[in-house]
From Swiss-Prot:
Example GO BP: dGTP catabolic process
EC number, UniProt record: 3.1.5.1
Keyword Hydrolase attached: yes
Entry protein name: Deoxyguanosinetriphosphate triphosphohydrolase
Stretches that traverse the bilayer: none
Catalytic activity: dGTP + H2O = 2'-deoxyguanosine + triphosphate + H(+)
Cofactor(s) named in the record: Mg(2+)
Disulfide feature: none
Domain HD: 66-273
Source domain of life: Bacteria
GO terms, molecular function: dGTPase activity; magnesium ion binding
Quaternary context: Homotetramer.
Purpose: dGTPase preferentially hydrolyzes dGTP over the other canonical NTPs.
């Protein structure tokens, strides 16, 4: 393990700043304290308070939003990081691993990645993602994209249809059709912090939220060596050049992951599994007693001293012998969380250490908590019960269907902007008005300033291209403009905006 040197990974350089020199420990710490301030004060973090965790449009403040969930993940991530660093200290390896001046940054990077891990999620969570992807797939038909034009190509955008004898342009068209049809919250998070909000975070901090490592346009087979790391899109074509720079700065291979990302992922896994069940009890989907029966059934035979006995059964015994029944739900989940975290955090930390070489290189092709251990089995039964009894609940499904309709409907409403000819849309952007397009003008006025500026900046960088390339790439960034705007809405704003524009109120 002589090749492990975290100084080569924990970079405090920033993409929009001159090279930073920092030799003293506190000078390094200051860079990551600056990251913390930029992140905590960003609008994207504030919007998480009105984005769903499991129950969309929830008015009960006791039920988790994305923000409260992210704060819980932040705490578990901090705990895992401290556990890892303490074990390095006990083994006398801190200096050998290049961590002497980086203990606080190590912890801070994990914490802030945990806080940010959901900022790219659209309204209504995964159903919002599906709505965006299905809407664009129906119009761009990425499945028909090959190296040559297809007779059954159903792409509705003329600039993106494949043409004979235009192999280079066809490759670009194909990539863009795939890219726009694979919206993903993790990829949108990279776009948010770098392109839209321009937080100018350190490379290490951004690297820690690059959870998946393939571009959204990827249409080839996924190599078996990275099939877990590449199972979802991690960034868009628009951010590809930045991700290339980030990989060079952090000494990451093409499809490899930043090492501290594994900790963020484990913290999320530990947090949401218990939280989703607690929210379900708060929503009266089942009682604690019914939940205990569901969990016992999923686990199978319980033996004294096994992990189920030390966590779930132990928490249930605490309330069975407790006092006032009216607080039994709170008591049960407090104990369940404490007992689960106490067992799973050390397990995640040890997995990080046991696989340190692969984790450091970023090619450890699984999650820290994805193994054959009782810890993994415990997480799996939490997930199974949530899938069978929470996510399939009629109230949840009804709200998800509403969310799907809201996002699809908003894309329909704003779609006239995508149908405008390039010259006319350019005039609309430049003049902030177009007399021949009164509806489109009013729709354009509703787009937020930061999203419009991101579009303008992207287009200014395309003026050297041929007319054919310009038409292709301009459509891409115009579509990104709509995806950015709608995905940045909160659940409630999207719902209200849809009702207003449909004249439903």
């Amino acid at each position: 393990m002589s090749g492990i040197d975290f100084k080569q990974k924990i970079s405090f350089q920033r993409p929009f700043s001159k090279p930073i020199e920092a030799e003293e420990e506190y000078d390094i710490v200051r860079q990551f304290e600056s990251d913390r301030g930029r992140i905590v004060n960003s609008a994207a973090i504030r919007r998480l308070q009105q984005k769903t965790q499991v129950f969309p449009l929830e008015r009960n403040a006791a039920v988790r939003s994305r923000l409260t969930h992210s704060m819980e993940v932040q705490q578990v991530g901090r705990h895992i990081a401290k556990e890892i660093l303490n074990r390095f200290k006990q083994d006398g390896r801190v200096d050998a691993l290049g961590l002497t001046k980086l203990l606080d940054p190590f912890e801070s990077i994990v914490e802030m990645a945990c806080l940010m891990h959901d900022i790219g999620n659209p309204p209504f969570g995964h159903f919002g993602e599906s709505a965006i992807n299905n809407w664009f797939s129906q119009r761009l038909d990425p499945a028909s994209c090959g190296s040559e034009p297809a007779s059954n190509d159903r792409c509705q955008v003329s600039a993106l249809r494949l043409h004979e004898g235009e192999s280079d342009l066809n490759r670009l068209r194909s990539r863009i059709r795939h890219d726009l049809s694979h919206f993903e919250g993790n990829a949108q998070a990279i776009r948010l912090v770098h392109t839209l909000l321009k937080l100018n975070l350190t490379y290490a901090q951004v690297g820690c939220i690059l959870k998946y490592t393939r571009p959204a346009y990827w249409a080839s087979d996924i190599p078996a060596s990275h099939n877990y790391l590449m199972k979802k899109p991690g960034f868009y074509l628009a951010e590809e050049a930045f991700v290339d720079r980030l990989r060079r700065e952090l000494n990451m291979g093409e499809f490899d992951r930043f090492p501290l990302t594994y900790i963020m992922e484990a913290a999320d896994d530990i947090s949401y599994c218990v939280a989703d069940l607690e929210d379900a009890v708060e929503k009266n989907i089942f009682t604690v007693e019914q939940l205990y029966q569901h969990l016992t059934q999923e686990w199978g035979e319980v033996t004294p001293g096994d992990l189920f006995d030390k966590t779930v059964a132990s928490a249930f015994r605490k309330i069975a012998h407790g006092g006032a029944r009216r607080s039994s739900e709170d008591q049960f989940f407090m104990y369940l969380r404490v007992f689960t975290v106490a067992r799973l955090v050390p397990h995640a930390a040890q997995r990080f250490i046991d696989n340190l070489e692969a984790v450091y290189q970023g090619n450890f092709n699984q999650a820290l908590l994805e193994d054959s251990s009782p810890a993994y089995q415990l997480l799996k039964i939490f997930k199974n019960v949530a899938f069978k009894h929470v996510f399939n609940h009629p109230e949840v499904e009804q709200l998800e269907l509403q969310g799907y309709r809201v996002i699809s409907g908003l894309l329909d409403i704003y779609s006239p902007l995508l149908a405008m000819p390039l010259a006319d849309f350019t005039l609309l952007v430049q003049e902030d008005s177009h007399r021949a397009y009164p509806i489109e003008t009013r729709l354009f006025h509703k787009l937020s300033t930061k999203h419009r500026l991101a579009y303008i900046e992207a287009i200014e960088g395309l003026q050297h291209l041929s007319p054919e390339q310009l038409a292709i790439r301009e459509y891409y960034f115009r579509a990104r403009l709509l995806q950015d705007y709608i995905s940045g809405m909160t659940d409630l704003y999207a719902y209200d905006e849809y009702r207003r524009l449909m004249a439903a109120e």
